[in-house]
Structure formats: structure tokens, C-alpha cells
A protein has these predicted regions:
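Active-site and donor-binding regions of nucleotide-sugar-utilizing enzymes
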Residues: 5-143, 267-270, 276, 285-289, ...
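Short, charged/polar "capping" segments at the starts of alpha-helices
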Residues: 65-74, 109-112, 206-208, 236-246, ...
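A nucleotide-sugar donor-handling region in carbohydrate enzymes
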Residues: 1-11, 133-196, 398-401
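Redox-cofactor binding/interface segments in oxidoreductases and associated redox assembly factors
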Residues: 102-103, 199, 281
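Active-site donor-nucleotide binding/catalytic segment of nucleotide-sugar enzymes
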Residues: 24-42, 182-242, 302
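Nucleotide-sugar donor-binding patch of glycosyltransferase catalytic domains
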Residues: 291-402
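Donor-binding and catalytic core of enzymes assembling or modifying cell-surface/extracellular glycoconjugates
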Residues: 88-95, 210-320
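Structural recognition of alpha->loop->beta junctions
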Residues: 72-89, 248-259, 334-342
């Protein structure tokens, strides 16, 4: 224990004397027990503050949990703010190559013990003057049995906060990937004169979803539009096609396209397809990814009018799911998403009321006591909204369930 404390004391001293402008290489150690697409889409974009803070230093990130490797790779591929993404065990990492290590992991205590066992001489004699900081509690939920060993790098965190929201979140899809999505859709019957609407139907919490009857009434309305086909993601190939046919009947179901068992990055290619003209869904990971893809397209010259209509519906958030109180508002999740039309369902005069986030003042954006869960949305209010945005006349729903 004394040896470990001596190593830690030397690292802490290095932290106190760090000069960010002299740092050449930075390593982020990232490990989480659960994976949420939307959380990580936003989180990895925040890494764009690291390079300018460290004056252009090389930035590598190592994902310790290999179980999520394919999904991590989908989110960081082509990201210009990250030089290398690896999936190595600690014994495979050349730690001495780095001047700064940033921990976003619950394993900080295990890390200091590992470094003491493998690098104590280099650390104590000053051969390796590494500074190690913790960002764990900035990005992850605190756990009762989680010991934070390393200090927060407050200057870096302050810089990240000061630059947050200056630019929208981005994902980086290449022209070749976009064309892959176009061809995949053509191979499944989408014609050049047809539009693709994408309906997102899954999320981490059931309360974030519409009632099933409301969802299918909306989908039925969309399928009645001319020259439109609708894409449904069936990531785990759980048999969604049969379920949709049961609800819609064979005739309307023929206008559906199901993507089954595709990789996450391939899903991105479909979201970014040139055929995609509308994306509708709950506050969920793929909606954040869609927003991020088109933010990047527009920054690189796409006319804003060429981006699809994107609509997310939100309501009351589960407090226990969130790291900070601010996370229980739609504004936290969508306030920096200029392309997304964010809807909120709330109670007004004891009746459900649907409002747009962009029309709320600061007090209304931060209010949570009047929010309702998403099962309070009606098909009528959503279809009327969709028809106004799509410039199509709403249909009369003979069997709609309000």
C-alpha cells in the first residue's frame, strides 16, 4: 500500500505542475458497464475540446470493454478529433508513450495498482512524468462502490463547458458510405422517384414511446402518401416484419422496408441516404445519430433544404436514468440540435398539450413538473403536425384511438 501511495503521490504532483501546451500525447481510458447510443454519440463529440486545449496533441482513446467494440467503432469512425481508437487490455498498452491519461472508467483503483506494479520505477525516478486525471463522474453515474482516485482536470473541464454548444454534435459519414446506403435501399425496391421515411420504434424506456395504436395510426397515414416507402430498423432481427403485417395488413406492409441485423454503422448509412426525407421517433440514440450525421453534411456544404425533416417526440424523463438533474429535460438532449423539431407533451389545464421546444422560453424549457409520459400523445395531434411539416393534407382516422 505504501508503494502504491508513493506512486500516486508522484502522479498527483505531476498533475499539479502540468503545462497543457507542452503535452504531446493524451490517452483516454474509457470503460462502461452499459452502452447507450445517444449518450455516447453526444459524449464522444465532446472530445473535440481536447485537441485545442492541448494545443493539437495526439489524442488516443482505448475502449476497455470489447463487448461494445463494434458500436464504439461506429461512433468514432472518421472522427477528426480522435487519432486512434483501440480495444486493448492494459498489458497491451504502451502507457509510457503518453504524457496525460484521462480516466472515464470505474476502475481507477485497479489502474493505480497496475501502474504501481508495472511502472513504479519509471514514475518515481521521473523518467515518466505522467499526469492522470479523472473525468469519470463528469460522464458516468456515480456508483456506491466506485472509488475515484485521480483528480479532476478542472481547467480542461471548464474549457469543455465553455465551448459546449458552440457547434452542433457531428458524426462523420463518407460519400462512399452514403452511396452504400443508397444502393442497399435500391436493392430492396426503392425507386429513384420515391422518398424514404424512417420510423424509429425502440428506445431504452417504454415510457418514451407512443402507445402502439397511436404509432400504427401515424404509420398508416404515412403509408397512404404517394411515392413513399418507410424503413423500419430491426437490429436484432426479432421478427418485426410479421408484427407490422399483423397491424397494417399485407397491402400497406408491402411499402415497408426492414433492415435486419445490420451493424450500427450500416444503420447510419441508411439514415444518411440521399433518399431519406423524413425521420420520426422518440428521444433515442438513432435520432441523435441522424441529427449528428446531417449536422456534419451541412457543415460540409449540403444545403439545409436537402436535409430530411427530423422530428423527435419527448415528454417526462426518468430521473433515475440520468446523471444530472439537467438531463431530465428535452432541452438538455435537443437544445443543440438545430435540424431536429423537438416536441414535448405536457399538461395544461388538466389536458395533454403538445408544444415545440423551439417555442418555449427558458422557464418553460426547464420546467419538469407538468411533463407527461409519451403515452399521452394522440395520433390526431401528431398527424396534424406531420401533415403541416410535410405539406400534406391530414387524413380522417376512422378507427383512431385518441
Amino acid at each position: 500500500m505504501k508503494a502504491t501511495q508513493a506512486v500516486l503521490n508522484k502522479i498527483l504532483d505531476n498533475c499539479r505542475h502540468i503545462e497543457a501546451g507542452l503535452v504531446k500525447r493524451v490517452l483516454i481510458l474509457y470503460e462502461e458497464a452499459e452502452f447507450f447510443i445517444g449518450d455516447n454519440c453526444l459524449r464522444f463529440d465532446q472530445l473535440k475540446s481536447c485537441k485545442p486545449f492541448f494545443n493539437g496533441a495526439m489524442l488516443d482513446i482505448n475502449f476497455n470493454n470489447k463487448h461494445f467494440a463494434e458500436r464504439y467503432q461506429a461512433l468514432v469512425k472518421n472522427n477528426p478529433n480522435i487519432d486512434h481508437a483501440t480495444y486493448l487490455a492494459w498489458k497491451e498498452i504502451d502507457f509510457e508513450a503518453y504524457d496525460v491519461i484521462i480516466c472515464i472508467t470505474y476502475e481507477e483503483e485497479a489502474l493505480i495498482k497496475y501502474l504501481e506494479a508495472e511502472y513504479s520505477a519509471a514514475i518515481l525516478n521521473g523518467k515518466w512524468n505522467v499526469a492522470i486525471f479523472s473525468a469519470t463522474l463528469h460522464y458516468m453515474k456515480p456508483l456506491a462502490n466506485c472509488d475515484i482516485i485521480f483528480p479532476s482536470y478542472d481547467d480542461l473541464m471548464d474549457y469543455a463547458v465553455s465551448t459546449a454548444g458552440m457547434e452542433p454534435v457531428e458524426l462523420y459519414l463518407t460519400a462512399a458510405e452514403r452511396e452504400w446506403g443508397n444502393q442497399w435501399l435500391r436493392d430492396r425496391g426503392l425507386k429513384d422517384d420515391e422518398q424514404l421515411f424512417i420510423m424509429l420504434d425502440s428506445t431504452s424506456r417504454k415510457k418514451k414511446l407512443l402507445r402502439t395504436s397511436v404509432y400504427f395510426n401515424i404509420l398508416s397515414y404515412l403509408l397512404e402518401q404517394d411515392k413513399v416507402k418507410v424503413l423500419i430498423f430491426d437490429e436484432k432481427n426479432i421478427g418485426k416484419e410479421a408484427f407490422y403485417r399483423h397491424w397494417l395488413g399485407d397491402e400497406k406492409a408491402e411499402r415497408l422496408i426492414f433492415s435486419k441485423s445490420l451493424k450500427l454503422r450500416e444503420d447510419f448509412c441508411l439514415l444518411g441516404s440521399a433518399y431519406t426525407k423524413m425521420i420520426f421517433g422518440p428521444c433515442t440514440g438513432l435520432m441523435h445519430c441522424a441529427s449528428s450525421i446531417y449536422n456534419n453534411f451541412i457543415r460540409n456544404g449540403m444545403p439545409r433544404s436537402d436535409a430530411p425533416l427530423m422530428i423527435t417526440y419527448t415528454g417526462k424523463y426518468w430521473r433515475l436514468d440520468q446523471i444530472w438533474d439537467a438531463c431530465i429535460t428535452a432541452y438538455y438532449w435537443w437544445g443543440n440540435s438545430p435540424l431536429v423539431n423537438c416536441l414535448i407533451i405536457r399538461k395544461e389545464a388538466d389536458q395533454p398539450e403538445m408544444v415545440e421546444l423551439c417555442n418555449l422560453n427558458e422557464e418553460e424549457r426547464n420546467a419538469t413538473d407538468n411533463l407527461l409520459f409519451c403515452d399521452a400523445y394522440s395520433d390526431t395531434m401528431l398527424i396534424n403536425y406531420l401533415s403541416s411539416k410535410l405539406n400534406r393534407a391530414p387524413v380522417v382516422l376512422m378507427n383512431a384511438v385518441a
